Curated annotation (Swiss-Prot):
Assigned protein family: Belongs to the DeoC/FbaB aldolase family. DeoC type 1 subfamily.
Primary role: Catalyzes a reversible aldol reaction between acetaldehyde and D-glyceraldehyde 3-phosphate to generate 2-deoxy-D-ribose 5-phosphate.
Keywords: Cytoplasm, Lyase, Schiff base
Recorded GO CC terms: cytoplasm
EC number from the UniProt entry: 4.1.2.4
HAMAP family for the chain: DeoC_type1
Top EC class, one word: lyase
Domain of life according to the entry: Bacteria
Annotated InterPro entries: Aldolase_TIM, DeoC, DeoC/FbaB/LacD_aldolase, DeoC_typeI
Protein name per UniProt: Deoxyribose-phosphate aldolase 1
One Pfam short name: DeoC
Catalytic site positions: 89 (proton donor/acceptor), 152 (schiff-base intermediate with acetaldehyde), 181 (proton donor/acceptor)
Amino acid sequence: MDLAKYIDHTQLKPDTTKQSIVKIVEEAKQHEFASVCVNPHWVSYCYNELKDTPVKVCTVIGFPLGATSTETKIFETNQAIADGATEVDMVINVGELKSNNDAFVEKDIRAVVEAAKGKALTKVIIETSLLTEDEKVRACKLAKNAEADYVKTSTGFSGGGATVEDIRLMRETVGPEMGVKASGGVRDLEQTEAMIEAGATRIGASSGVAIVSGEQGTSDY
């Protein structure tokens, strides 16, 4: 198993410096990770550094709360793609899901999917740590109905990250055709292999180098 191809090498902390972005870009080149996942501000730099490599540029939309307007999420998506992103990880409106406004949640997701269509993959962050089991299932079904490419567990900003149980539930809910991304607190090889065995097809982690080296990472992201 080529673990590097599963990993979105991630740096989303609010105090991220240019130096730390340069570092993850170089690590991504060296290990040929699936992507680097960075905040929108850094997309253009990462694209210019990675455009001649197999490493994709992934960014986040409506991050980390998901509570921006749909129009804002569309604008962010268009700007990210213009800057060179080919994968976007958008956060659902968790409050509307919990208010049983499923039609709004699906429409919000679909708007980003449509903006990205043909240009970028869309991954939908459902923020599992804030949801009941029923809400997790509903969120996954809404993302699937909206024709997103992936469902993703967590932002890493709301406490709690990916669990094997959640990955298994998400995989069972969306079936074999959608991607499932485990993100938040995945720090080592053992955790990564357990997530993949449970159904994850992508791993979001800032500990990518530690994972592929069989070491223990320290970050929550």
